Amino acid sequence: MTHKPCLLYSQLPAIDRLLREPQITPLVEQYGQTLVTATLRRMQEQARINIKQYQALPDWCDNWASALGQQLEQKQALALKPVFNLSGTVIHTNLGRALMAESAIEAVTQVMRSPVTLEYSLNNAERGHRDHALADLLCELTGAEDACIVNNNAAAVLLLLATVASGKQVVVSRGELVEIGGAFRIPDVMVQAGCRLVEVGTTNRTHLKDYRQAINEETALLMKVHTSNYNIDGFTAEVSGRELATLGIASQIPTAIDLGSGSMINMVQYGLPAEPMPQDYLNQGIDLVTFSGDKLLGGPQAGIILGKKHWIEAIQRHPLKRALRADKMTLAALEATLRLYQRPEQLCQQLPTLRLLTRSQQQMHDMAQRLLPQLQAHYGDQFIVRDEPCYSQIGSGSLPVDRLPSWALTFAAVEGQGSSLERLARCWRGLAKPVLGRISGGRLWLDLRCLEDEKALLQALLL
């Protein structure tokens, strides 16, 4: 080791000395001595590596207190950061899907702060069942005989299959063997549930006779899967829920449908495209229906199974149910969300997801007009800033081919600055509250459909 590195190593202050510095004492009080000491040790190690590689101290060695404060702040920052979702996707899987209603937020806060009757009966002071209160509410809203709640819809499908058809055959149309995000595939779920898949029909056309011909003594379930994240047009045919239910009754084989997203209300009344409703399939005679809580329903992540009482009771008894059950926070948020559906005339105002989906294009246009002048003044030297019509998508596999007319602010790089859009997007992602748009067609788009606070967005972008 040369003389210079030796001198540099000797300039590294001892941990005890650093902890006694007046500028670091407040950090110890704020973050605790254990965390501060561990961070200082890591900083010392970083400095030693810098000396070894570059024969120089890091720049921050001139002010250990300031560098320590920055590292502690970064370390304590929450991993789940609030963001401005201006991506154009309303129910964005990567951004947490549905936003909670205020009543759901209050309900979660309450059950976090106090013991609650999660599995306790006040009537007889005995153990209760965590699903019963919500099951009654779901039955009231949908006409189902009974209901089961688990932690997501994938769990609902897995539990249903494991209960009804483990070791047996499940008949599904070839055109409905869906894959959703994260490589979640219906055939793979069947394998995990111990079922044997029997594909019938073709990719674009499946008839009732295809199901009928596949039935044998090993058939345990006739199943439909709603193709919520893609659509097949043209020369197509599919078996309706009523047809499948009729065949199931005649063959004494249960029937099920996985709706994926699903909606508890008729979306057409709000000017939105139609989405299958679980109560419709129950009315058609389908035995079991599964759907998500955090998509069009507008609630927390949850999987909901509705259907015939004897099948729901069997599902509740399955050992997997305990592994997949929902916790008290999920149940509280889901109950509060479902209670909003008891007052459908107020739903559009109280359910954030529905409110965002039903915003008129004129509302976003008006927002763009208010925001545009200040953004043009701030970014005009480097970017051409305009307001333009665009289309939002619902997201999370809901109504995949339908788009919602919206309005956006767009940023186009001036000539010769092609990489500046990526730099700008990266800069916005690094803000205290990141701003997330999308780059398309040589422009950075900020779709305003999900913008709730114009003032906060301007404060973020004009720094």
Swiss-Prot record:
Keywords: Cytoplasm, Protein biosynthesis, Pyridoxal phosphate, Selenium, Transferase. It catalyses: L-seryl-tRNA(Sec) + selenophosphate + H(+) = L-selenocysteinyl-tRNA(Sec) + phosphate. Its EC number is 2.9.1.1. SUPFAM superfamilies: PLP-dependent transferases. The modification N6-(pyridoxal phosphate)lysine is found at residue 295. Converts seryl-tRNA(Sec) to selenocysteinyl-tRNA(Sec) required for selenoprotein biosynthesis. Homodecamer; pentamer of dimers. Binds only one seryl-tRNA(Sec) per dimer. Belongs to the SelA family. This is L-seryl-tRNA(Sec) selenium transferase. It comes from Photorhabdus laumondii subsp. laumondii (strain DSM 15139 / CIP 105565 / TT01).
